[in-house]
């Protein structure tokens, strides 16, 4: 570790009867030497002593910034952090960060910023700091207020003096760190999430930073603006992602506001994939209603109320006006861009190995499928558009390869369905929705092998052999596909390979019997180990274990009596 080791002897020497100037001089050098350190090699006793000494001095105006920086650096190391932090130190950091409202605090912008950065680290790594933060709901209310109070017009007229007195550069950075703190606070405690989800001011306060980006010309949007907007939408996701049904904070007014801001961000063309991703994630949260009047309306064709004299048969449902697919296309394009990166990473390693980075990208694409699926459920126009974009009518050339081998959005989605992840489920559900929940169409496009898990989970295996509806093929097949579809393997979704002869050609009957018995023995071994169990499709359409192998024969056809030797 660079610089002086913070042993008990060193700590006592620095603080014992030392002037503020001497303490500042020592820790200025120590902080500089350890600016890039992540390990500090301190014992529990050394951390306890340092925490007590810093706690006693940190409220000194001359030392606050430098000692906060020291705590921030040491808090990079999760191990042993609880020994450093005591209740008084935690409360002082909250006070210096302006979060616990106390008259006369914060005292300086520099100390405020250091306290914010310190709080980001300690909130993330320390249960003790989180406990001190969450025990007072005023802390959360204060942060939420700050999420919108630093917008230029509000800051200039704020009734908080220290906010009014900041210059724009300082205010921009302080505002960003309050969003960082809000993101961590909303990620760590469900009770805190519920508190914010129940408030009518939450949506407007959180998304204020995103709206500021939209109000600026693209050339005027600074990188810090984008970082702040990104944190804001991640916080929105944290607050609402665990709830279902009606949430007080998402009333009609706030739903309209959230959908408008998120739509505009997604469609804005902002050259920042993280911001677009966070907006799509926020749009996907279950309790946020899909407000089609915002998400799919065409601003060039406003809805005109129809006269009351028009009959019900002549009336056009308002949803029939919501045919603007700009948002739908933007989400599809962002999804495809994400999956191109993910599939490239997955294919860059051997099939039996894992690409952690590729799997992470796949996991992050789950909300894209969720948002699209919800749009498609609410709007037949969105569903049709997605079906045309993702599952265009099949042609003969497309079934020469397996679905996952295609360099297309469909191929990449099927590749995702091959992974053992939760994204596999939402990707399958999205495809099933745009297949109009048709089992036969789903199998045709992705193969039974890829769709079996989804069909089994939803009890749909019993529909596999049902007759097709005319609509299953009328808009999903071409003439050249019809010419080859009888040669398509329904399991793989691709054509059978050319016949290269049977593997048993040239074998004697004794050899064939020997190979058959080897297969039987191998299957018996797997069954004895519990790795394989005989199963059948139950009345609910799901796979169930059979109690006896004879169950597998109950629906077998009777033997042809014409070949019987009996009279």
Curated annotation (Swiss-Prot):
Question: Which GO biological process entries does UniProt record here?
Answer: G protein-coupled receptor signaling pathway; protein localization to cell cortex; regulation of establishment of cell polarity; regulation of feeding behavior
Give the Gene Ontology MF terms in alphabetical order.
G-protein alpha-subunit binding; guanyl-nucleotide exchange factor activity
Where is this gene product found? Answer: Cytoplasm, Cell cortex
Task: List the gene name.
Answer: ric-8
Query: Its family?
Result: Belongs to the synembryn family.
Q: Which UniProt keywords apply?
A: Chaperone, Cytoplasm, Developmental protein, Guanine-nucleotide releasing factor
Where is this protein chiefly located? cytoplasm
Q: Name one GO cellular component term.
A: cell cortex
Does Metal-binding count among this protein's keywords?
no
What task does this protein carry out?
Chaperone that specifically binds and folds some, but not all, nascent G alpha proteins prior to G protein heterotrimer formation, promoting their stability and activity. Also acts as a guanine nucleotide exchange factor (GEF) for G alpha proteins by stimulating exchange of bound GDP for free GTP. Able to facilitate synaptic transmission in the nervous system probably by activating G(q)-alpha (egl-30). Also able to activate the G(s)-alpha in synaptic signaling network.
What name goes with this protein? Chaperone ric-8
What is the superkingdom listed in this entry's lineage?
A: Eukaryota
Which InterPro entries does the entry mention? Chaperone_Ric-8_A/B, Gua_nucleotide_exch_fac_Ric8
